[in-house]
Amino acid sequence: EMASCAGLPLVEDRKDPRKTTTYGVGQLILAAAESGVEKIIVGLGGSSTNDGGCGAAAAVGVKFYDRDGKEFVPTGGTTADICKIDLSGKAEILNKVEIVTMCDIDNPMYGPTGASHIFGPQKGADEAMVLELDEGIKNLSRAITEAIGKDISEVPGTGAAGAMGAGMIAFFGSRLQMGIQTVLDTVKFDEMISDADYIITGEGKLDSQSLRGKVVIGIAERAKKQDKNVIAVVGGADDAEIDKAYEMGVTAVFPINRLPQDF
């Protein structure tokens, strides 16, 4: 779980996505691989970072060079300085391990719905910083395309966790899959609800991101196939999102703490 070493709770009131790094995540992945496991599942989400996974990549031997040919470890604030990426030094043991990455959003790397614009503000970025971070990720995308021979910037989920989704594909050869779908498959959810009358689920806030494949909608989509009723108890929700949730298979939404609204 990347949030355990690169998550928002760890920085508290010191949020700055220009400086935070995923280096520790890479160290953990490498340590797990060296322990002899055959499969590693990396959970994305709740990160304080916006470095596109460059820190994690550097921790396993990937090298980044600036325009002067100097090697450095990029952070969110310096991804714009990346000129070249060298994958040849990556730890060979990672090629012997299956790495699966779970994420619950389908955002692209950059742009209006990308990592920086959608998630930057919650990591401490103001409007100007969001634009700076987005340009950095855009440059990283260019460098990745040059390094691996294909453009992955529009692959759903590459914008997850400060574009860590893109880094997992490009630097670790991982595949991305929806976290909620993985969990539901693991617990045999479809069988579990076969004789249920109601399915009660919940989320902190039902918002636009929820509608892009998080827990509530993931469950609703499965339940809809069996004509099951889904009740969502959420911390808060806007009326527009509630209406869309109904369209996507949710039977009823009950916010326990509705935000004040004008009449």
PLM features: residue spans?
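N-terminal loops that bind phosphate or other acidic moieties
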Residues: 1-44, 48-263
